[in-house]
Protein backbone atom coordinates (compact mmCIF):
# COMPACT_ATOMS: atom_id res chain seq x y z
CA UNK A 1 0.00 0.00 0.00
CA UNK A 2 1.51 3.31 -1.07
CA UNK A 3 -1.43 5.66 -0.50
CA UNK A 4 -3.60 6.67 2.42
CA UNK A 5 -6.68 8.69 3.27
CA UNK A 6 -6.18 12.12 4.78
CA UNK A 7 -8.51 14.92 5.84
CA UNK A 8 -7.44 18.22 4.31
CA UNK A 9 -8.71 21.71 5.11
CA UNK A 10 -8.66 24.21 2.29
CA UNK A 11 -10.50 27.53 1.99
CA UNK A 12 -12.56 26.76 5.07
CA UNK A 13 -13.77 23.39 3.80
CA UNK A 14 -12.79 19.81 4.65
CA UNK A 15 -12.37 16.96 2.22
CA UNK A 16 -10.97 13.43 2.35
CA UNK A 17 -8.26 12.84 -0.22
CA UNK A 18 -5.91 10.05 -1.21
CA UNK A 19 -2.25 10.99 -0.88
CA UNK A 20 1.05 9.14 -0.75
CA UNK A 21 2.07 7.67 2.59
CA UNK A 22 4.96 9.87 3.78
CA UNK A 23 8.53 8.64 4.12
CA UNK A 24 10.25 9.52 7.40
CA UNK A 25 13.37 11.63 7.11
CA UNK A 26 16.39 11.77 9.43
CA UNK A 27 15.33 11.57 13.07
CA UNK A 28 11.72 10.96 12.08
CA UNK A 29 9.23 8.12 12.54
CA UNK A 30 6.28 7.03 10.42
CA UNK A 31 3.29 6.32 12.64
CA UNK A 32 -0.26 5.10 12.11
CA UNK A 33 -2.92 7.34 13.60
CA UNK A 34 -5.08 5.42 16.09
CA UNK A 35 -7.05 8.29 17.60
CA UNK A 36 -7.06 12.06 17.21
CA UNK A 37 -9.12 14.67 19.03
CA UNK A 38 -10.86 17.53 17.27
CA UNK A 39 -9.38 20.66 18.83
CA UNK A 40 -11.01 24.07 19.06
CA UNK A 41 -8.06 25.40 17.07
CA UNK A 42 -8.98 23.01 14.23
CA UNK A 43 -12.45 24.54 14.22
CA UNK A 44 -10.96 28.04 14.38
CA UNK A 45 -8.53 27.60 11.48
CA UNK A 46 -11.35 26.16 9.38
CA UNK A 47 -13.73 29.02 10.12
CA UNK A 48 -11.13 31.80 10.12
CA UNK A 49 -8.46 30.56 7.71
CA UNK A 50 -7.38 33.98 6.47
CA UNK A 51 -6.97 35.41 9.99
CA UNK A 52 -4.87 32.43 11.10
CA UNK A 53 -2.74 32.48 7.96
CA UNK A 54 -2.09 36.22 8.45
CA UNK A 55 -0.64 35.38 11.87
CA UNK A 56 1.41 32.54 10.36
CA UNK A 57 2.84 34.96 7.78
CA UNK A 58 3.69 37.60 10.38
CA UNK A 59 5.41 34.96 12.54
CA UNK A 60 7.37 33.53 9.62
CA UNK A 61 5.53 30.18 9.66
CA UNK A 62 4.30 30.84 6.12
CA UNK A 63 5.83 32.92 3.35
CA UNK A 64 4.48 36.47 3.19
CA UNK A 65 3.26 35.93 -0.37
CA UNK A 66 1.60 32.54 0.32
CA UNK A 67 -2.02 32.33 -0.76
CA UNK A 68 -4.91 31.62 1.57
CA UNK A 69 -5.76 28.53 -0.48
CA UNK A 70 -2.99 26.47 1.18
CA UNK A 71 -4.05 23.03 2.40
CA UNK A 72 -3.65 22.04 6.03
CA UNK A 73 -3.68 18.34 6.91
CA UNK A 74 -5.26 18.67 10.34
CA UNK A 75 -4.75 16.74 13.58
CA UNK A 76 -2.41 17.34 16.54
CA UNK A 77 -4.06 15.57 19.54
CA UNK A 78 -3.06 12.01 18.83
CA UNK A 79 -2.25 8.48 19.80
CA UNK A 80 -0.38 6.49 17.18
CA UNK A 81 1.50 3.27 16.43
CA UNK A 82 5.11 3.09 15.28
CA UNK A 83 5.34 1.73 11.73
CA UNK A 84 8.83 2.56 10.50
CA UNK A 85 11.91 4.54 11.45
CA UNK A 86 13.76 6.99 9.22
CA UNK A 87 17.56 7.28 8.97
CA UNK A 88 19.64 8.46 11.92
CA UNK A 89 17.20 7.13 14.49
CA UNK A 90 17.88 4.86 17.47
CA UNK A 91 14.78 2.68 17.15
CA UNK A 92 14.59 2.15 20.91
CA UNK A 93 10.83 1.56 20.83
CA UNK A 94 9.70 -1.52 18.92
CA UNK A 95 7.57 -1.22 15.82
CA UNK A 96 3.95 -1.58 16.87
CA UNK A 97 4.47 0.38 20.09
CA UNK A 98 1.70 2.87 20.79
CA UNK A 99 3.01 6.40 21.28
CA UNK A 100 2.05 10.01 21.62
CA UNK A 101 4.19 13.14 21.49
CA UNK A 102 4.33 16.88 21.69
CA UNK A 103 2.96 17.75 18.21
CA UNK A 104 5.89 19.60 16.72
CA UNK A 105 8.62 18.58 14.32
CA UNK A 106 12.00 19.70 15.63
CA UNK A 107 13.35 18.35 12.36
CA UNK A 108 11.19 20.93 10.54
CA UNK A 109 12.24 23.92 12.62
CA UNK A 110 9.65 23.33 15.33
CA UNK A 111 6.66 23.54 12.98
CA UNK A 112 3.37 22.34 14.43
CA UNK A 113 2.05 18.94 13.34
CA UNK A 114 -1.50 19.16 12.03
CA UNK A 115 -1.67 22.95 11.97
CA UNK A 116 1.06 23.93 9.48
CA UNK A 117 0.66 23.80 5.68
CA UNK A 118 3.02 21.23 4.17
CA UNK A 119 3.09 18.85 7.15
CA UNK A 120 1.11 15.67 7.75
CA UNK A 121 -1.51 15.67 10.50
CA UNK A 122 -3.15 12.95 12.57
CA UNK A 123 -6.51 13.18 10.77
CA UNK A 124 -4.56 11.11 8.24
CA UNK A 125 -4.11 7.35 8.36
CA UNK A 126 -0.34 7.86 8.69
CA UNK A 127 1.83 10.84 9.58
CA UNK A 128 5.35 11.82 10.67
CA UNK A 129 6.66 12.57 14.17
CA UNK A 130 10.10 13.11 15.68
CA UNK A 131 11.70 10.16 17.47
CA UNK A 132 13.16 12.47 20.12
CA UNK A 133 9.70 13.47 21.36
CA UNK A 134 8.04 10.03 21.48
CA UNK A 135 6.34 8.89 24.67
CA UNK A 136 5.17 5.27 24.91
CA UNK A 137 1.54 4.92 25.94
CA UNK A 138 1.10 2.65 28.98
CA UNK A 139 -0.67 -0.62 28.14
CA UNK A 140 -3.63 0.19 30.41
CA UNK A 141 -4.31 3.53 28.69
CA UNK A 142 -6.68 3.33 25.69
CA UNK A 143 -5.59 5.16 22.56
CA UNK A 144 -8.54 7.55 22.76
CA UNK A 145 -7.45 8.47 26.30
CA UNK A 146 -3.89 9.16 25.20
CA UNK A 147 -5.24 11.46 22.48
CA UNK A 148 -6.57 13.70 25.26
CA UNK A 149 -3.05 14.25 26.65
CA UNK A 150 -2.49 17.34 24.52
CA UNK A 151 -5.44 19.47 25.70
CA UNK A 152 -4.73 18.41 29.29
CA UNK A 153 -1.19 19.75 28.85
CA UNK A 154 -2.55 23.08 27.60
CA UNK A 155 -4.66 23.44 30.74
CA UNK A 156 -1.81 22.35 33.01
CA UNK A 157 0.54 24.88 31.43
CA UNK A 158 -1.99 27.68 31.94
CA UNK A 159 -2.26 26.80 35.63
CA UNK A 160 1.52 26.65 35.97
CA UNK A 161 1.79 30.05 34.29
CA UNK A 162 -0.62 31.51 36.85
CA UNK A 163 1.64 30.68 39.84
CA UNK A 164 -1.30 30.64 42.24
CA UNK A 165 -1.39 30.22 45.97
CA UNK A 166 -3.87 27.57 47.10
CA UNK A 167 -5.94 30.22 48.91
CA UNK A 168 -6.36 32.30 45.75
CA UNK A 169 -9.71 31.96 43.98
CA UNK A 170 -9.79 30.67 40.40
CA UNK A 171 -12.48 31.44 37.84
CA UNK A 172 -12.37 29.16 34.81
CA UNK A 173 -14.30 30.76 31.95
CA UNK A 174 -15.54 28.21 29.43
CA UNK A 175 -15.94 24.54 30.32
CA UNK A 176 -14.77 23.02 27.06
CA UNK A 177 -11.71 20.74 26.92
CA UNK A 178 -9.17 23.43 27.90
CA UNK A 179 -11.35 24.80 30.67
CA UNK A 180 -11.91 21.33 32.09
CA UNK A 181 -8.18 20.62 31.81
CA UNK A 182 -7.46 23.79 33.77
CA UNK A 183 -10.03 22.83 36.42
CA UNK A 184 -8.44 19.39 36.77
CA UNK A 185 -4.96 20.91 37.07
CA UNK A 186 -6.14 23.42 39.66
CA UNK A 187 -7.68 20.63 41.71
CA UNK A 188 -4.50 18.55 41.55
CA UNK A 189 -2.49 21.61 42.58
CA UNK A 190 -4.65 21.99 45.69
CA UNK A 191 -6.47 25.25 44.91
CA UNK A 192 -9.37 25.44 47.36
CA UNK A 193 -11.86 27.60 45.43
CA UNK A 194 -12.44 26.85 41.74
CA UNK A 195 -15.41 28.59 40.11
CA UNK A 196 -16.53 27.22 36.74
CA UNK A 197 -18.26 29.81 34.55
CA UNK A 198 -20.19 28.75 31.46
CA UNK A 199 -23.56 29.85 30.05
CA UNK A 200 -24.41 26.26 29.10
CA UNK A 201 -26.06 24.67 32.12
CA UNK A 202 -25.23 21.27 30.61
CA UNK A 203 -21.55 21.92 31.48
CA UNK A 204 -22.26 22.28 35.21
CA UNK A 205 -22.08 18.61 36.18
CA UNK A 206 -18.89 17.78 34.30
CA UNK A 207 -17.19 20.92 35.63
CA UNK A 208 -17.99 19.84 39.19
CA UNK A 209 -16.83 16.28 38.46
CA UNK A 210 -13.49 17.60 37.16
CA UNK A 211 -12.91 19.54 40.36
CA UNK A 212 -14.81 22.83 40.32
CA UNK A 213 -16.08 23.74 43.77
CA UNK A 214 -18.80 26.00 42.39
CA UNK A 215 -20.59 26.63 39.09
CA UNK A 216 -21.88 30.02 37.97
CA UNK A 217 -23.99 30.74 34.90
CA UNK A 218 -22.60 34.16 33.90
CA UNK A 219 -25.85 35.16 32.20
CA UNK A 220 -27.61 34.94 35.57
CA UNK A 221 -24.97 35.67 38.22
CA UNK A 222 -21.74 37.63 38.60
CA UNK A 223 -18.90 35.12 38.82
CA UNK A 224 -16.31 37.86 39.47
CA UNK A 225 -18.23 39.23 42.46
CA UNK A 226 -18.62 35.68 43.77
CA UNK A 227 -14.87 35.10 43.49
CA UNK A 228 -13.96 38.44 45.05
CA UNK A 229 -16.17 37.71 48.06
CA UNK A 230 -14.45 34.35 48.54
CA UNK A 231 -10.94 35.73 48.01
CA UNK A 232 -10.88 38.37 50.73
CA UNK A 233 -7.24 39.47 50.84
CA UNK A 234 -6.20 36.73 48.41
CA UNK A 235 -6.06 37.09 44.64
CA UNK A 236 -8.69 36.34 42.03
CA UNK A 237 -7.22 34.48 39.05
CA UNK A 238 -9.34 34.36 35.89
CA UNK A 239 -8.62 31.71 33.23
CA UNK A 240 -10.16 32.82 29.92
CA UNK A 241 -10.60 29.49 28.12
CA UNK A 242 -13.57 30.37 25.90
CA UNK A 243 -11.87 32.25 23.07
CA UNK A 244 -14.72 34.80 23.00
CA UNK A 245 -13.10 38.11 22.10
CA UNK A 246 -15.40 40.47 23.99
CA UNK A 247 -14.71 38.65 27.25
CA UNK A 248 -11.14 39.90 27.54
CA UNK A 249 -12.10 43.56 27.89
CA UNK A 250 -15.09 42.57 30.03
CA UNK A 251 -12.87 40.83 32.57
CA UNK A 252 -10.36 43.67 32.56
CA UNK A 253 -13.23 46.01 33.47
CA UNK A 254 -14.68 43.74 36.16
CA UNK A 255 -11.63 42.11 37.72
CA UNK A 256 -10.72 43.29 41.23
CA UNK A 257 -7.40 45.03 41.89
CA UNK A 258 -4.28 42.84 41.71
CA UNK A 259 -6.17 40.06 39.91
CA UNK A 260 -4.53 37.87 37.28
CA UNK A 261 -6.09 37.09 33.90
CA UNK A 262 -4.69 34.05 32.08
CA UNK A 263 -5.64 34.06 28.40
CA UNK A 264 -5.66 30.63 26.75
CA UNK A 265 -8.40 31.33 24.21
CA UNK A 266 -7.06 32.12 20.73
CA UNK A 267 -8.15 35.58 19.53
CA UNK A 268 -7.12 36.11 15.91
CA UNK A 269 -9.17 39.25 15.26
CA UNK A 270 -8.10 42.69 16.57
CA UNK A 271 -9.65 43.56 19.95
CA UNK A 272 -10.83 46.84 21.40
CA UNK A 273 -9.37 46.73 24.91
CA UNK A 274 -9.16 49.57 27.42
CA UNK A 275 -5.90 48.88 29.22
CA UNK A 276 -6.31 51.90 31.50
CA UNK A 277 -8.37 49.73 33.84
CA UNK A 278 -5.67 47.07 33.86
CA UNK A 279 -3.04 49.70 34.63
CA UNK A 280 -4.93 51.43 37.45
CA UNK A 281 -5.89 48.11 39.07
CA UNK A 282 -2.41 46.65 38.46
CA UNK A 283 -3.78 43.52 36.86
CA UNK A 284 -1.46 40.77 35.66
CA UNK A 285 -2.38 39.81 32.11
CA UNK A 286 -0.70 36.52 31.15
CA UNK A 287 -0.97 34.73 27.82
CA UNK A 288 -0.65 30.95 27.73
CA UNK A 289 -0.50 28.87 24.57
CA UNK A 290 1.81 25.88 24.48
CA UNK A 291 3.44 23.71 27.16
CA UNK A 292 6.73 22.13 28.08
CA UNK A 293 7.51 18.47 27.25
CA UNK A 294 7.52 17.79 31.00
CA UNK A 295 3.95 19.11 31.28
CA UNK A 296 2.90 16.89 28.38
CA UNK A 297 4.47 13.85 30.05
CA UNK A 298 2.82 14.76 33.36
CA UNK A 299 -0.56 14.96 31.63
CA UNK A 300 -0.14 11.45 30.21
CA UNK A 301 0.84 10.22 33.67
CA UNK A 302 -2.24 11.88 35.17
CA UNK A 303 -4.38 9.87 32.76
CA UNK A 304 -2.50 6.62 33.43
CA UNK A 305 -2.74 7.02 37.21
CA UNK A 306 -6.46 7.71 37.12
CA UNK A 307 -6.12 11.25 38.46
CA UNK A 308 -8.20 12.61 35.58
CA UNK A 309 -11.47 11.04 34.44
CA UNK A 310 -10.72 11.29 30.72
CA UNK A 311 -13.83 9.25 29.83
CA UNK A 312 -16.06 12.13 30.85
CA UNK A 313 -14.28 14.46 28.43
CA UNK A 314 -14.75 12.13 25.43
CA UNK A 315 -18.30 12.62 24.15
CA UNK A 316 -18.15 11.35 20.57
CA UNK A 317 -16.19 9.30 18.06
CA UNK A 318 -16.15 9.29 14.28
CA UNK A 319 -14.46 7.63 11.30
CA UNK A 320 -12.46 9.47 8.68
CA UNK A 321 -15.38 9.94 6.30
CA UNK A 322 -17.55 11.47 9.01
CA UNK A 323 -15.20 14.30 9.99
CA UNK A 324 -17.05 16.98 8.00
CA UNK A 325 -20.30 15.98 9.70
CA UNK A 326 -18.59 16.17 13.10
CA UNK A 327 -17.33 19.66 12.28
CA UNK A 328 -20.82 20.69 11.17
CA UNK A 329 -22.08 19.56 14.58
CA UNK A 330 -19.36 21.52 16.38
CA UNK A 331 -20.04 24.65 14.31
CA UNK A 332 -23.47 24.86 15.98
CA UNK A 333 -24.43 24.99 19.69
CA UNK A 334 -23.88 21.49 21.06
CA UNK A 335 -23.13 19.51 24.21
CA UNK A 336 -19.92 17.85 23.00
CA UNK A 337 -16.66 18.19 24.92
CA UNK A 338 -14.20 16.16 22.83
CA UNK A 339 -14.86 14.20 19.64
CA UNK A 340 -12.25 11.56 18.79
CA UNK A 341 -11.47 10.75 15.15
CA UNK A 342 -10.36 7.21 14.32
CA UNK A 343 -8.77 7.70 10.88
CA UNK A 344 -8.26 3.96 10.31
CA UNK A 345 -12.00 3.36 9.90
CA UNK A 346 -15.13 4.84 8.38
CA UNK A 347 -18.31 5.85 10.17
CA UNK A 348 -20.48 8.82 11.07
CA UNK A 349 -20.40 10.66 14.41
CA UNK A 350 -21.59 8.61 17.38
CA UNK A 351 -22.26 9.94 20.86
CA UNK A 352 -20.26 8.31 23.65
CA UNK A 353 -20.99 8.50 27.35
CA UNK A 354 -18.33 8.36 30.06
Residue ranges, per PLM feature:
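Rossmann-fold dehydrogenase core element
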Residues: 260-262, 273-312
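Residue-level recognition of short, solvent-exposed, well-ordered loop/turn junctions
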Residues: 25, 94-97, 130, 165, ...
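Glycine-rich beta-strand-centered segment in the early N-terminal region that forms part
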Residues: 22-36, 51-105, 138-140
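C-terminal hydrophobic helical "lid"/dimerization subdomain
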Residues: 245, 249-253, 293-354
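NAD(P)H dinucleotide-binding glycine-rich loop of Rossmann-like/cofactor-binding domains
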Residues: 62-71, 76, 99-173, 311
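Mid-domain Rossmann-like dinucleotide-binding core that forms the NAD(H)/NADP(H) cofactor-binding site
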Residues: 141-220
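Glycine-rich cofactor phosphate-binding loops and adjacent beta1-alpha1 units
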Residues: 162-165, 205-284, 347-354
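Residues in the short beta-alpha loop(s) of Rossmann-like NAD(P)-binding domains
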Residues: 200, 267, 291
Amino acid sequence: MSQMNSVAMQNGKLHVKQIDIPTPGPGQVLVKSLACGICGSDIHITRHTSDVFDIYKNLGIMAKDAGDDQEVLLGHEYAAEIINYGPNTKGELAKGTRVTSVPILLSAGGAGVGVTPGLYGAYSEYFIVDEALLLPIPDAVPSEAAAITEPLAVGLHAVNRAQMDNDDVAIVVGCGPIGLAAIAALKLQGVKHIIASDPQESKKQIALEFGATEYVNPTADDEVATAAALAGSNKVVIFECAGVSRLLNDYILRAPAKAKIIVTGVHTAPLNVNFAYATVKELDLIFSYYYQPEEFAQSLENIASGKIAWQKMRTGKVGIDGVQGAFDTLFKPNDHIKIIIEPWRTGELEKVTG
